[in-house]
Amino acid sequence: MGQKINPHGFRLGITTGWKSRWYADKQYAEYVKEDVAIRRLLSTGLERAGIADVEIERTRDRVRVDIHTARPGIVIGRRGTEADRIRADLEKLTCKQVQLNILEVKNPESQAQLVAQGVAEQLSNRVAFRRAMRKAIQSAMRQPNVKGIRVQCSGRLGGAEMSRSEFYREGRVPLHTLRADIDYGLHEAKTTFGRIGVKVWIYKGDIVGGKREVTAVAPAGAERARRERPSGTRPRRSGAAGTTVTGTDAGRAVGGQESAATNIGHSDDSVVTHEPQIAES
């Protein structure tokens, strides 16, 4: 089920929170309808604003709308004209006072919704879908908080007669793990031969006890020291042509030199040999 269900709904109340926060008894259906209308209004009027998320919170006589965007200048407009227009449209829709908060997204490459929008925009501009997917994966994996990403495109890819789905993945994306922090985004690209759906899953680590789990990183010096070859054990040509001394043989040669050096001045009986010794009965 982790492969099919929406990752946000699957982990709701465990690692993810609600995007609409309010309480209603008899007006529940009306509030849900208003929330859908608010999100649709913001998505259709601000396609190029890079809106990653919309959070709605209601009180008795006020509605607070938080817009997380990668381009706050487009949402605000010149001297705040665009923000005033959006606020007026929302007040007309809800018939209540609207508090509009515009928040900037610091790392748009690590937001699944923005990555999906970027891939869909490239597909609309006739960019090859494989190139767009790989470019999005490479830019996302450069972020320090991204541990895995999966990008999937579905539709008439490349203008083919039959629709199909293709995906690319890099890193870990554990969709069945509930404690995993999975960000999910979906967007549609409108092309001349139909619509292509773009889905993005981004894995940002595990959340244990309400805190993100930090994996210990080994120091670079220790890894470098482990990978370096011991001095004097470089593969060299010896014997017949085409034969090369292996790392095991070189290590044995160095071990024999060290044992001979430590036993200088002692009798030959104390020298350790690698030949098997048979105990006398």
From Swiss-Prot:
Record bears the keyword Ribonucleoprotein: yes
GO terms under biological process: translation
Protein name: Small ribosomal subunit protein uS3
SUBUNIT field: Part of the 30S ribosomal subunit. Forms a tight complex with proteins S10 and S14.
Highest rank taxon of the organism: Bacteria
Keyword RNA-binding: yes
Annotated family: Belongs to the universal ribosomal protein uS3 family.
Record PANTHER family: 30S/40S RIBOSOMAL PROTEIN S3, SMALL RIBOSOMAL SUBUNIT PROTEIN US3C
Chain intervals for the UniProt region annotation (Disordered): 218-281
Task performed by this protein: Binds the lower part of the 30S subunit head. Binds mRNA in the 70S ribosome, positioning it for translation.
Annotated GO MF terms: mRNA binding; rRNA binding; structural constituent of ribosome
Feature: compositional bias, Low complexity: 238-256
